[in-house]
Structures are given as structure tokens and as C-alpha cells.
Amino acid sequence: NTSKHLVTTIKGLSEAQLNFKSSPDSWSIAECTEHIAISENNIFGMLEGALKTAADASKRADVKMTDEQILAMIVDRSNKVKTMEAFEPTGKFGNQEATLKAFLEKRKANIKFVKTTEEDLRNRYQQLPFGTIDAYQILLFMSAHTERSKSECKFSEELNNHK
């Protein structure tokens, strides 16, 4: 469970540990956590945008990537991607506790949506820089992105070196 892993990873860390950067161009654990919280919200916002349009099966052919390809592309850390400004950490939540709370609340709401939705997720679409994906694939993208962000931020490595 991603939420539990994130909580366990940062539980009990000092401010110095949360804000430590292994290099000037890397993100701290606090910044990684904020990026994950921002992304959870923003990517779900893309899904909400797709759901505002009518389902249209005639556009299925615009979706070129399979679910498996989406997941593989997102978690593949050799595929370096510059974070868009809207997803960069800015301190908007104020502190680590508020950041974690924002992520956990949004993740809980997103899971509830997934479990209860009756929306046609396969015939609504969103255009991303790498192509058109359907609304179901947006959910896969969101989930895989959180996993990738945890890996890229090297939580475990930094914790082991600085506890």
C-alpha cells in the first residue's frame, strides 16, 4: 500500500532529515512528498477533465498505448522526464504534516472514486505530451507515477545515510 509505505518512510524523521538534499539539484524527502501530493491532485484533475466530456467510442483508435505500456513507461526510471512547473514542490502545504494529510485525503477520495464509479472510463480521453490516453489509463498513470516518484526520490537510500 503506497500510503502506508509513505507514512512509514517519513515517520519520526527530523526536520533536518526531511529537508536534506543529497545534491543541490536533487529534491529532499519533504519536496518529494509534496510532489507526490501535488501530483495525486493534479493527475486526478486530468481525469475529472476527461469525465466532463461525453463518452465517445469513435475516438478509441486515438489511444495508441496499452495499459501495460503506460505502466512500463511511467515506472521506467531510465526514461528521464522534467517535472512540469505545476507539479514542482513550492511549500504550498506549509509543513510535512499538512503535505502528508493532503496526500492521504486525496488518495482516499481517489480510491473511493475507483471503487464506486460507474463512469465509462474507456471512452473518455485526455491528451498528454506522449499521446492520447483514456480515463482508465489516467488512473494507471497516477498510480504508477506515485511509485516512480518514491523511487526517484530515493527515500530509503537517504534515510539509511542520514538517520
Predicted regions located by residue number:
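Short, well-ordered helical secondary-structure segments
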Residues: 5, 14, 74, 120, ...
